[in-house]
């Protein structure tokens, strides 16, 4: 993580095990020390109690109880979606930024959006959109054609640890 540009934010996702309080505190402390924003997936109470920068709401979470909660000043809610119906849910959940995926072909999923469908979905919302899914060194230059405020990659960043200037 130290090699990554500090503009790269971290989303802590732990769907399999019970959350370890010490591990969470260490991750938050590490990110704050290195001036990196840290979000936690699906756990609003933990996010607020442990000074996370925000909450990430995955596409499968359709709960609408997030919007009317009083949050600290710079706390940010972000989410992910795969289609227009999920984008509308993320808007109702109060997400400031929405990750739309998959932009390019990925192994885990049968279909993908492609640039024109992705841009069409982006045009249907006023929220900041982040491109996600299948982004790698072969298609990285195609991101110039995408109407998004940024991009996210899991496997490419893990594999290459790019330092973005």
PLM segments and residue spans:
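Inter-domain helical "communication" segments and dimerization helices
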Residues: 3, 16, 36, 75, ...
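N-terminal active-site wall of soluble small-molecule enzyme domains
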Residues: 6-70
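Histidine-centered beta-alpha loop that forms part of the nucleotide-sugar donor binding/catalytic region
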Residues: 13, 82, 103
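Acidic (Asp/Glu)-rich catalytic clusters
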Residues: 1-6, 30, 69-72, 91-92, ...
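Alpha-helix-loop-beta-strand connector modules within alpha/beta enzyme cores
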Residues: 23-40, 67-83, 111-134
